[in-house]
From Swiss-Prot:
The gene is RPL18. The keyword Ribonucleoprotein applies. Keywords: Ribonucleoprotein, Ribosomal protein. Residues 156-166, 173-183 have a biased composition (Basic residues). This is Large ribosomal subunit protein eL18. Belongs to the eukaryotic ribosomal protein eL18 family. One of its GO terms (cellular component) is cytosolic large ribosomal subunit.
Length: 183
């Protein structure tokens, strides 16, 4: 745009910030795939491998099952962690690729006859299979509840930063009719 004098001021990561050697190997592999194949899928995965942890939210088993419904035979791909969800009673047979699985999530998927793949295993099967790209909910973090219009302004449901949740900490004035007013 003109303000920046024709320069693009947006920054894009070109490599992961982390020093994790296994992540760097994956990046090396997917850089190769992006260069040698004209697959958009590989490019998206490479871009997501660079992302910060906040932008790689975990996906719970229950959401994974919901998103994979009717897509049997395809491989779910999550650039992030897959976590267990005890609210799910029976797990269907699913194939999933993720950066990380929690122990219980991995055990339950495998017990149901599913597969937990890594990204290098996925790269070997890529041309042969259909994939479903998934991500976790980014705004489900605790920190996000504190964002928005200041707590205390009308119709704001923003969570205040309180040192303790006791009776006398931001619970009375402005919170209930009997104590002055209620927003």
């Amino acid at each position: 745009d003109l303000k920046a004098g024709g320069k693009n001021k947006k920054t894009k990561r070109t490599s992961p910030k982390s020093n994790d050697i296994y992540l760097k190997l994956l990046v090396k592999l997917y850089r190769f795939l992006v260069r040698r194949t004209d697959s958009n899928f590989n490019a998206v995965i490479l871009k997501r491998l660079f992302m910060s942890k906040v932008n790689r939210p975990p996906l719970s088993l229950s959401r994974l099952i919901k998103y994979m419904q009717g897509k049997e035979g395809k491989i779910g791909v999550v650039v992030g962690a897959v976590t267990d969800d005890i609210r799910v009673y029976d797990v269907p047979t699913i194939k999933v690729t993720a950066l990380k699985f929690t122990e219980t999530a991995r055990a339950r998927i495998q017990k149901a006859g599913g597969e937990c793949l890594t990204f290098d295993q996925l790269a070997l099967r890529l041309p042969l299979t259909d994939t479903v790209l998934l991500r976790g909910p980014k705004n489900a973090r605790e920190a996000v509840k504190h964002f928005g219009p200041a707590p205390g302004v009308p119709h704001s449901h923003t969570k205040p930063y309180v040192r303790s949740k006791g009776r006398k900490f931001e619970k009375a004035r402005g919170r209930r009719k009997s104590r002055g007013f209620r927003v």
